[in-house]
């Protein structure tokens, strides 16, 4: 990137637009998909370039500038929760000079000469959340979202061990804010479980926590080892205490978990000493921290300082430097995932970083390799900040030799040699060859047999690779004819290396056992991109039986608009997922395989767990403002009674509940002659349901 100190106004205008688009994409990947595309340090670098350009050319600041936004726009998978006060992020200090500037700004703003006490806390590398209590009862939990509107994760938070559902001696209204995280050892154990179940491993504890708390299926969240710390009282904190130190004491007395590792610093020297102490000892903590948060201790002074667009003036995060190492890049391998996405991985001369021997590192994406000019046989800099595999941050050009080799971004799939499809400016590259691609086929079979899919015990990744190599299976269907094929083979499976009579007998028994399966698990086992367990359940619930499901999907592949609209109305099935479903069933091989699987499996119809009642299976839409209960509560009640609540009115809608100012949804319902009731009728309706 060119020297931004010498950049022209025209160049700055263009670069600000590029930065806004790129940072928005990175925010979406990090906050919404829990799948970061770049390292924290690279993100911070881009963000700081954006800030510097905006300071130099303030008249060029865009309306969608990342400096004005927190997090990312939320999805439609969860109900929305409007925060009582914005949940902003913190500005960053990367060195002592940045921190001294922060302390000087406090003095200048408050017009004081003396040092005012600063409260110092570890910066937990987790997921921010808010929790609301009324009369001591926990009623609403939400993610940060975009800072102003979060996602409703109330039921998910309730699964966290030791999180209080009821508080004694609490004020009438209470908000607390904190961080949800997973401890290091729990994270390692979780990834072992993921691997054993043929499921993807999480990149780091933060990603695992984010992916766990944002599950549509609360039962999955309940299985995850989530913990939390509370660090703020939100809009109510100044009713509880007059300082941050007093607040944490009060929150602890109310039975919340607070971080005991904190310090009230009375001088600049004490701040730096606390930072050095945590930086040195962070590896001994059971959880990941990535810096220290400093806040003015006095709430009255915090009020005087106020906020800027996306962060408070009275607080700052002092980031730790990542653990750095240097080693030789031996090669770059390209992995092809189950859905065809290609990922570059650096193969390294083994090196110890932070007590862990590292032989592989992530290169994030192919654009990243070109931007950093990473070449095979280069000496590369690594950083490790809690990731399972570290990140390559740059190249030691001074050690570059003449025999280094530039990496060519693949044009053809390394597994099947088919032409690749480039998505998002080379950041994402896909192979669209599906089952005909050996790598995708292998990953898809591994997913098919995994615990939450067909659940065939004794058939893990190693065994699948062996059976494919010996040409005993080539697709999921072959698994169910393996016993028959084995009986006619010259060399039987039980006589091959790594197998025995008992293990083979158990495998065949487990294969037979797996042939009776619920519709939702069967749909999940198919491995459709973005169709996880919850979305598989939504589809199973919508179509009811295997025969109806496959018939409707065949119509969808032929561009049937009614089926398309029906899927589009399902809460949780957005445009992106709908495109993935259409793409999957457009491939004839996929449909043929599913039909053949249907002939050998006993796929059970979807069974609703709740009792049947008047609302079961009905599609309901809420519009306008309700006065007696919130929209979120109304939605939960409707779903508990078996209804499907959707966001838009269509021909498939059975009932519209209209509050005050119903708007366009109410108008459309009248045009389509859909039954409409008001709030009073709705309350009477659910009472008798």
Swiss-Prot record:
Keywords recorded for this protein, A-Z: DNA damage, DNA repair, DNA replication, Ligase, Magnesium, Manganese, Metal-binding, NAD, Zinc
Lyase recorded as keyword: no
Pfam families in UniProt: BRCT (PF00533), DNA_ligase_aden (PF01653), DNA_ligase_OB (PF03120), DNA_ligase_ZBD (PF03119), HHH_2 (PF12826)
GO biological process: DNA repair; DNA replication
Keyword presence, Kinase: no
GO (cellular component) term, any one: cytosol
EC number(s) given by UniProt: 6.5.1.2
Chain positions recorded as Zn(2+) binding sites: 413, 416, 431, 437
Listed InterPro entries: BRCT_dom, BRCT_dom_sf, DisA/LigA_HHH, DNA_ligase, DNA_ligase_AS, DNA_ligase_CS, DNAligase_adenylation, DNAligase_N
Name of the featured protein: DNA ligase
Taxonomic source organism: Rickettsia prowazekii (strain Madrid E)
Gene name for this UniProt entry: ligA
């Amino acid at each position: 990137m060119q020297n931004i100190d010498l950049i022209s106004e025209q160049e700055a205008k263009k670069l600000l637009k590029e930065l806004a688009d790129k940072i928005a994409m990175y925010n979406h990947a990090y906050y919404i998909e829990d799948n970061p595309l770049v390292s924290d340090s690279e993100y911070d670098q881009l963000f700081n370039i954006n800030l510097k350009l905006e300071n130099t050319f303030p008249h060029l600041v865009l309306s969608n500038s990342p400096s004005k936004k927190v997090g990312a726009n939320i999805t439609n998978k969860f109900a929305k929760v409007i925060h009582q006060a914005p949940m902003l992020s913190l500005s960053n200090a990367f060195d002592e000079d940045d921190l001294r500037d922060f302390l000087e700004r406090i003095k200048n703003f408050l017009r004081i000469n003396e040092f005012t006490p600063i409260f110092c806390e570890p910066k937990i590398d987790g997921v921010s959340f808010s929790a609301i209590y009324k009369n001591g009862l926990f009623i609403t939990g939400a993610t940060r979202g975009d800072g102003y509107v979060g996602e409703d994760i109330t039921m998910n938070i309730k699964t966290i061990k030791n999180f209080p559902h009821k508080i004694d001696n609490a004020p009438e209204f209470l908000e607390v804010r904190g961080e949800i995280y997973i401890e290091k050892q729990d994270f390692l154990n979780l990834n072992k479980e993921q691997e054993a179940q043929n499921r993807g491993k999480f990149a780091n504890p933060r990603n695992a926590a984010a992916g766990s708390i944002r599950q549509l299926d609360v039962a999955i969240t309940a299985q995850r080892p989530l913990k939390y710390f509370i660090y703020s009282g939100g809009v109510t904190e100044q009713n509880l205490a007059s300082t941050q130190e007093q607040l944490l004491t009060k929150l602890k007395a109310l039975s919340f978990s607070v971080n005991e590792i904190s310090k009230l610093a009375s001088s600049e020297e004490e701040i730096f000493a606390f930072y050095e102490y945590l930086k040195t000892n962070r590896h001994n903590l059971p959880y990941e921290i990535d810096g220290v948060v400093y806040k003015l201790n006095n709430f009255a002074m915090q009020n005087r300082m106020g906020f800027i667009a996306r962060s408070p003036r009275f607080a700052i995060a002092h980031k730790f430097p990542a653990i750095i190492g240097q080693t030789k890049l031996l090669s770059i391998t390209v992995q092809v995932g189950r859905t065809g996405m290609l990922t570059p991985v650096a193969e390294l001369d083994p090196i110890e970083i932070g007590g862990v021997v590292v032989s592989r590192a992530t290169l994030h994406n192919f654009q990243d390799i070109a931007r950093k000019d990473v070449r095979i046989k280069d000496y590369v800099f690594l950083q490790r900040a809690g990731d399972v595999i570290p990140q390559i941050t740059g190249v030691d050009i001074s050690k570059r030799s003449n025999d280094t080799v530039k990496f060519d971004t693949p044009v053809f799939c390394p597994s099947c040699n088919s032409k690749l499809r480039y998505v998002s400016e080379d950041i994402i590259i896909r192979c669209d060859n599906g089952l005909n691609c050996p790598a995708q086929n292998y990953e898809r079979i591994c997913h098919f047999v995994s615990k939450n899919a067909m659940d065939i015990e004794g058939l893990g990744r190693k065994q699948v690779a062996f059976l494919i190599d010996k040409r005993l299976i080539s697709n999921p269907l072959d698994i169910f004819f393996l016993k028959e094929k084995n009986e006619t083979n010259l060399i039987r499976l039980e006589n091959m290396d790594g197998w025995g009579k008992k293990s083979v007998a158990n495998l065949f028994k487990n294969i037979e056992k797996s042939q009776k399966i619920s519709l939702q698990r069967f749909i999940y086992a198919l491995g459709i991109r973005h169709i996880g367990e919850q979305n598989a359940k939504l589809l199973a619930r919508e179509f009811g039986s295997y025969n109806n499901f496959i018939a409707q999907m065949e119509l969808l592949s032929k561009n049937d608009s009614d089926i398309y609209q029906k899927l589009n109305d399902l809460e949780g099935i957005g445009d992106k997922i709908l495109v993935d479903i259409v793409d999957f069933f457009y491939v004839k091989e996929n449909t043929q395989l599913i039909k053949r699987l249907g002939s050998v499996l006993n796929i059970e119809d979807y069974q609703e767990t709740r009792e049947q009642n008047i609302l079961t299976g009905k599609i309901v839409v809420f519009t306008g403002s309700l006065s007696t209960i919130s929209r979120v509560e109304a939605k939960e009640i409707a779903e508990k009674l078996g209804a499907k609540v959707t966001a838009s009115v269509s021909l498939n809608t059975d009932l519209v509940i209209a509050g005050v100012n119903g708007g366009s949804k109410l108008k459309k319902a009248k045009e389509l002659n859909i039954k409409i009731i008001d709030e009073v009728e709705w309350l009477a309706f659910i009472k008798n349901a």
